[in-house]
């Protein structure tokens, strides 16, 4: 626990900045095959305890992970709800810690791999906190953070990071990119902790179809799987924002992108073309084969309310003792 150099909001009495050591692996492959050689990166986040917290109690934890546009008001509203329910929350500051504010249109400065590592390093660090019960810890995130919440359940990554010593008890990915799928099916090795995806029917930034296809592949593998999905009707990317639907000209539309991933976390261009997508330039070239530009994003009142309600019920069910 320490002081941070970058905090995007003023702290209240029940908050503290927690700083820990992480790294900057570009890809899952770099975590699995080369983590010990990655240069150290200082990362911080904001730990918030419930306002009525008792210093003699250990609280269940929810780690929140932002999307490509960094933290927004609707994200913080979820965390506030969780705090009012008696959870401690950790607002991971992966972007600010690397002096990045947005990765829209590039997706290379702060990657899913980096933030998954950050999440587990945070979990390990918080295991030493006297008021945190990391045996009852969940993770949720939006867009890029949804990808973190999803693929942080992939066992080869967990084993490479900490040998399975620290794991999440529940994963709630909100409109995640589901375009990477472990291949062949023997690599579909996920935690048996519950995973539930929330996504919009009309999402063209990260399409729901990729997630339903991934889930189908998981169950076909006949390996232990505990995953489900809710698709909200008439809802775009960022359906839980309080905003009109607009087009983001810089963002990718990932409708047709699907990339197999081997046991070392290396993405290939396809099951037939084993061309690795393991560097920023190769990632950009791969996206040229399947992605467009100009996804839509914006709120849907019914989906937003349903998402908040589901999130509260999901974490209460799986994290409360």
Language-model segments: what does each one mean?
Residues 9-57:
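N-terminal cap/lid segment of alpha/beta-hydrolase-fold proteins
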Residues 32-43, 57-128, 289-296:
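Serine-hydrolase catalytic machinery in alpha/beta-hydrolase-like enzymes
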Residues 51, 93-100, 177, 235:
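Short beta-to-alpha linker loops that shape the active-site pocket of alpha/beta-hydrolase fold enzymes
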Residues 77, 206-218, 244:
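Short alpha-helix in the alpha/beta-hydrolase fold that links the catalytic acid
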Residues 113-191, 204, 209:
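Primarily recognizes the serine-hydrolase "nucleophile elbow" in alpha/beta-hydrolase
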Residues 192-203, 227-230:
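Catalytic His-Asp charge-relay segment
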Residues 202-206, 237-238:
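Acidic catalytic loop of the alpha/beta-hydrolase fold
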Residues 225-321:
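C-terminal catalytic histidine-bearing segment of alpha/beta-hydrolase fold enzymes
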């Amino acid at each position: 626990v320490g002081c941070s150099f970058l905090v995007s909001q003023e702290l209240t009495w029940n908050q503290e900045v927690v700083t820990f050591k992480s790294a900057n692996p570009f890809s899952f492959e770099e975590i699995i095959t080369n983590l010990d050689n990655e240069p150290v990166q200082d990362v911080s986040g904001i730990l918030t305890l419930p306002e009525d917290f008792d210093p003699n109690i250990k609280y269940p934890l929810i780690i929140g992970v932002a999307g490509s546009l960094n933290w927004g008001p609707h994200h913080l509203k979820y965390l506030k709800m969780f705090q009012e329910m008696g959870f401690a929350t950790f607002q991971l500051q992966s972007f600010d810690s690397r002096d990045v504010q947005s990765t829209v249109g590039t997706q290379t400065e702060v990657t899913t791999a980096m933030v998954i590592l950050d999440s587990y390093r945070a979990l390990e660090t918080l295991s030493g906190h006297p008021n945190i019960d990391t045996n009852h810890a969940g993770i949720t995130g939006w867009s890029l953070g949804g990808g973190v919440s999803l693929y942080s359940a992939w066992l080869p990554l967990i084993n490479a990071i900490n040998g399975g010593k620290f794991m999440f008890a529940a994963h709630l990915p909100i409109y995640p990119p589901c375009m990477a799928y472990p291949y062949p099916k023997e690599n579909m090795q996920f935690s048996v902790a519950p995973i539930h995806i929330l996504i919009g029917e009309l999402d063209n930034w990260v399409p729901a179809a990729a997630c339903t296809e991934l889930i189908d592949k998981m169950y076909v593998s006949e390996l232990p799987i505990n995953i489900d999905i809710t698709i909200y009707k008439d809802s775009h990317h960022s359906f839980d924002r309080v905003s009109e639907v607009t087009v983001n000209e810089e963002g990718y539309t990932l409708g047709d992108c699907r990339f197999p991933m081997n046991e070392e976390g290396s993405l290939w261009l396809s099951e037939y073309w084993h061309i690795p997508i393991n560097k920023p330039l190769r990632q950009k070239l791969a996206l040229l084969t399947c992605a467009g530009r100009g996804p839509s994003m914006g709120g849907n009142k019914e989906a937003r309310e349903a998402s908040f309600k589901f999130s509260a019920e999901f974490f209460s069910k799986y994290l409360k003792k």
